[in-house]
């Protein structure tokens, strides 16, 4: 283990056979950051960071990224249990061989344009990316991200963690059943979704790899169940989240699990979404974190 401190296209409805799963409550399905700690939900009036080839767009550039993408993206409906389904945005890579599947877990703001644009970048990097809307059953109204965000923040605090993990189980099974998919999957999440992606490593023994962007770590008592390698990527100016790193690192070290993490000096919570912020530190963090993300998935899912 190591710590490295470094300066809408076509809509298609599909249904999968019901997936039966069990889950154990792991961490609260809540995000405890204050509004001031979050990157802005809408950045339409904020300056966008310069678009760097090979990086996801920031929030201000997400819609343009989606509108100009050459890749095939589609909406699907995935059956997750008796009477339950989750909608998801799926983006396919342009490659001649079968691809690993990556689940993309949204922030507290819900399945925003920005999260879908991150899925598009993962597809550009060679993965089948599936971003589930974990608020599907809340029936939030359609609308721009600025309308969705405050509703999502309130709704996400009511989600049951075990239910969230069952949704992810079903989405993973769906993804690996696709004709173009390998039978391996990883997960990446941001903020609230980062905590969920770490919790999924506790929950899912078949998970191939997890990447956690500025999400809190699970309770140390749960970490013995982790089997997948976990990569954590954190802003140095994110004290509440960063305080949960050392206990996880120590516990996973004793257990002999693979947990690597980087803390980027000066970068804030949500640095990948808000690349123009924190006086250049967020963009520097994004430029280091995203290649590390892709390399992690390639190492553990492509080999």
Regions found by a protein language model. Name each.
Residues 26-58, 62, 66-67, 75-177, ...:
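Serine-hydrolase catalytic machinery in alpha/beta-hydrolase-like enzymes
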Residues 232-234:
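Short beta-strand/loop motif that positions the catalytic acidic residue
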Residues 258-303:
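C-terminal catalytic histidine-bearing segment of alpha/beta-hydrolase fold enzymes
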Residues 194-205:
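Short glycine-enriched nucleophile-adjacent loop
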Residues 179-190:
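Alpha/beta-hydrolase fold nucleophile elbow
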Residues 206-215:
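A conserved short beta-strand
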Residues 237-242:
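Acidic catalytic loop of the alpha/beta-hydrolase fold
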């Amino acid at each position: 283990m190591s710590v490295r401190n470094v300066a809408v296209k076509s809509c298609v409805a599909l249904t999968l056979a019901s997936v039966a799963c069990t889950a154990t409550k792991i961490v609260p399905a809540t995000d405890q950051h204050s509004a001031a700690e979050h990157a802005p939900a809408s950045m339409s009036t904020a300056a966008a960071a310069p678009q760097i080839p090979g990086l996801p767009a920031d929030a201000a550039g997400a819609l343009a990224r989606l509108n100009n993408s050459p890749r095939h993206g589609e909406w699907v409906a995935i059956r997750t249990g008796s009477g339950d389904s989750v909608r998801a945005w799926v983006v396919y890579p342009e490659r001649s061989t079968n691809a690993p599947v990556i689940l993309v877990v949204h922030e507290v703001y819900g399945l925003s344009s920005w999260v879908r644009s991150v899925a598009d970048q993962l597809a550009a990097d060679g993965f089948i990316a599936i971003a589930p809307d974990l608020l599907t059953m809340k029936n939030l109204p359609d609308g721009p991200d600025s309308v969705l965000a405050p509703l999502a923040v309130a709704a996400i605090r009511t989600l049951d963690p075990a239910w969230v993990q069952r949704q992810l189980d079903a989405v993973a099974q769906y993804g690996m059943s696709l004709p173009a998919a390998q039978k391996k999957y990883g997960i990446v999440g941001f903020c609230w979704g980062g905590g969920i992606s770490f919790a999924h490593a506790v929950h899912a023994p078949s998970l191939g790899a997890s990447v956690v962007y500025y999400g809190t770590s699970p309770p140390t008592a749960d970490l013995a169940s982790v089997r997948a390698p976990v990569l954590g990527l954190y802003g140095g100016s994110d004290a509440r989240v960063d305080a949960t790193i050392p206990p996880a690192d120590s516990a996973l070290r004793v257990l002999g699990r693979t947990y690597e993490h980087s803390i980027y000096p000066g970068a804030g919570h949500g640095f990948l979404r808000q690349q123009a912020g924190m006086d250049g530190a967020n963009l520097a963090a994004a430029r280091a974190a995203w290649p590390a993300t892709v390399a992690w998935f390639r190492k553990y899912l492509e080999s």
